[in-house]
């Protein structure tokens, strides 16, 4: 059964089981990367957020939710993804920010999604995605691209990995 998201779904309590929601699109500002090596994902995240936060301020935009990565194809040894933040209104045009990073307007897709929360360290995300996609299929739904991760818990050096929450989301066909 599909539920309408009553508040931003990325600010809700953890989704302890696979939940189907109908959601509106959400304006975002992102750095898009194509054919980026999986081994350089942490560098992509670090460079994006080092440039993104100050750039939002200069553009008069406010973040309205946690960081995310949106994947436009299944990853292999490389990934095509957008890394960014949801914002209070769309960015008018691309902006070149710190270190020459181009930030572009985008959005988290609206429509019917499946979502579940992974509670634990990032190194458990691969298994969590496998279980999530299996549960979605077993419930009779067909995952579609894109899919995305929402990093509800902001990582920090003092963070207990067991307390971290990452929401796994896929658009449904």
Question: Where do the model's predicted regions map?
Answer:
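A solvent-exposed interaction/effector surface
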Residues: 1-173
